């Protein structure tokens, strides 16, 4: 009821929403706010493209895709400027019924991205084989002090596989320009990270993209 707001990152609001059994309402409220943000930027002539973290369980709500399409239409925001980002571990847990659930959301026109963390290195093949995931984000392994080779070498085979399947490959959490040489060698398409640009870093979306 106040005009003051507290920005909750995905790691904060998802556990709260699960505990309250409010995953779908929380995700929708979150998405609506960001779509409005995109509209504001487009009105001002700025080109803002976003990755939006979404719980995989949202896909199994039959009303989710129609609602998403209606939100884009209501705010006059083209759906292709948004990529819905799914955590690889969550997606793997829902793998048996995931493929069919992705189709209605695909028809809305949004890109679908897979966010792969350090704990998701095993058994990525089945997820990468899903055509709907056109974008794959690989997070830097280790902390910012880890050497570039140490931080990115664990992803070398997975990046090569994703590229062979025609995916757009994104490296997230880039710690500095020293990482870029390794990423170029691996054939990564885009790099993201606060080290490249601090713009809106507090949103934890890595808005800044530097094409390699």
Name each region found by the language model.
Residues 22-97, 173:
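Catalytic core of bacterial c-di-GMP phosphodiesterases, primarily the EAL and HD-GYP domains
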Residues 2-5, 55-60, 83-94, 110-212:
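EAL-family c-di-GMP phosphodiesterase catalytic domain
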Residues 1-15:
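A short, well-structured catalytic beta-strand-centered motif of the EAL phosphodiesterase domain
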């Amino acid at each position: 009821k106040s005009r003051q707001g507290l920005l909750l990152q995905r790691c904060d609001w998802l556990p709260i929403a699960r505990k309250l059994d409010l995953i779908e309402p929380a995700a929708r409220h979150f998405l609506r706010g960001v779509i409005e943000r995109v509209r504001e930027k487009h009105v001002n002539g700025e080109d803002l493209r976003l990755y939006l973290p979404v719980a995989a369980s949202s896909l199994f709500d039959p009303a989710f895709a129609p609602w998403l399409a209606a939100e884009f239409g209501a705010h006059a925001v083209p759906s292709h400027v948004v990529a819905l980002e799914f955590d690889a571990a969550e997606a793997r847990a829902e793998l048996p019924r995931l493929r069919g659930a992705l189709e209605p959301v695909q028809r809305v026109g949004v890109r679908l991205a897979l966010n792969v963390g350090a704990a998701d290195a095993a058994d990525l093949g089945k997820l990468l084989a899903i055509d709907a995931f056109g974008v794959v984000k690989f997070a830097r392994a280790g902390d910012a002090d880890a050497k570039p080779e140490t931080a990115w070498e664990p992803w070398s085979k997975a990046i090569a596989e994703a590229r062979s399947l025609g995916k757009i490959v994104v490296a997230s959490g880039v710690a500095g320009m020293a990482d870029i040489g390794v990423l170029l060698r691996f054939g990564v398409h885009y790099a993201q990270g606060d080290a490249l640009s601090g713009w809106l870093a507090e949103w934890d979306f890595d808005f800044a993209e530097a094409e390699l």
